[in-house]
């Protein structure tokens, strides 16, 4: 997303270089070419991070989703529109979004571990954890709750059933 996060990701994952959009485009195409012997390949778009469609992180993700869509079209590969389907569901939100994605590590960890505690210790569903934080699909603004998982399940099931 930015230079610092790219450097951190490179270091934490022992990558040879900082991930870039240009490398993503190139490597996605190469990966599909390597998988060409597999009879059926399907790509899916990336889910949002946070639930504000016009946030800078989701604008960044849209760039990658456009690349995924274009690659699927160019290579004649099926596409599961995960992102579009999740945004459609977010339009059905029954309560206002209270806060949105904060890229700082400490707030992310608080949301993740807080969600885990509420789910596993207090036995709240992921959707209830999300609701308690003013979220609809992403209980910690990153990971899907049951509502979001059902959308991806239905997309996948429909794709498998159709062919």
What does each of the following model-derived ranges do?
Residues 1-163:
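Alpha-helical cap/lid subdomain in secreted, periplasmic
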